């Protein structure tokens, strides 16, 4: 039987094949072109190399393409995109190749290389790059460190809303999936605990389908029954991990990763189960409640907002200089950047970075106390604009007070901008706290770089495109 020939898509094909090596002119006023031309790459690459040397234990191997990788980091910072999209953009988007210094080369960094480079820099490394950009803005008179305002915010994690039944269902699913990937080492555990997995699946389905119409007591009873099943799984899993301990050293690649994951989930659930039992018994949430099985370092942050009283993720302190440039400080724990503490710490960090305190400083009423006002004055702040609580008086009056109130309101706009989808501060595609923190600093870096290039373009009376 003769095969039919496929009809060509074009009724009138080209006489000569079109070239796949186009020659185009990149506009001088393109945002990425101006950014590339204005950045002092010598200084920036020296800083990147210094950060890299502090983290690399051996200099063996081929040297990295720091110029291209730093350009890729800047490109990703100014507009949120996945790593593979970044690779594709750098390969085919002329302004991005110009930013990475690759217009005379056919080489392109792949997605894995870009990701490894960012993870090597880490949150602290990208924070230092951001401080470099802010100091550059101060030199260009686009930012004024003499006036600073500060606030705290929450970086929400990309996790489902935590509840006890959901966390236990996640545990069972993770244990089953990881045990299958481990292979023969946990084959006996899967066979022995098969009935428990079926029971857990049935209870989760019943809860999700029918608990909506039941009373709180009935819901708690269903949760307690599920907790009993999970406890049995935990006991059998602990025995299986002990018996298979000698085998773990022979595991390779994906099986080794699955073994590590199942151990981590097992340890997390050992802490979570008592918290669930405490909640069922008392009706109160336990201190340091685990809200994510896969990222147990996350915590709840009470915000008191309308429609969103609690957020789940990480706490950050944000400082804003006059001119709009931002500096971000990651909390080491849940209470590290509480308003009452960060109101003073922000000025201390400012002194560390610039060598002297701001002349004027503003913070909302969450940071007010007479002790904080006195401490800020001792640090050298002339105009202390902490919004007072109750009937207490302001430490400043008149136009100074009005100016500080106006500047204080602007920090909310900056925080809202970095949380927009363009920069990706909120709910980043991250599976660890370290990656979340890195994404947060990268969002602030992109915000400052875009602000920087717009300010420099305005001086030239140039309208940016791209």
Protein language model regions, located:
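Catalytic micro-motifs at enzyme active sites that drive phosphoryl/nucleotidyl and oxygen chemistry
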Residues: 60-61, 99-105, 136-137
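Basic, short loop/linker segments at the boundary and entry of helix-turn-helix/winged-helix-like folds
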Residues: 25-74, 78, 394
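Amphipathic alpha-helical interaction surfaces
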Residues: 75-78, 92-96, 320
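A short structural micro-motif
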Residues: 54, 93-96, 136-139
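Anion-binding and metal-coordination hotspots
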Residues: 82-85, 90, 106-107, 114-466
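Short, positively charged loop/turn segments that connect secondary-structure elements
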Residues: 93-113
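Charged, often Cys/His-bearing segments associated with DNA-binding zinc-finger transcription factors
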Residues: 1-44, 49-50, 454-466
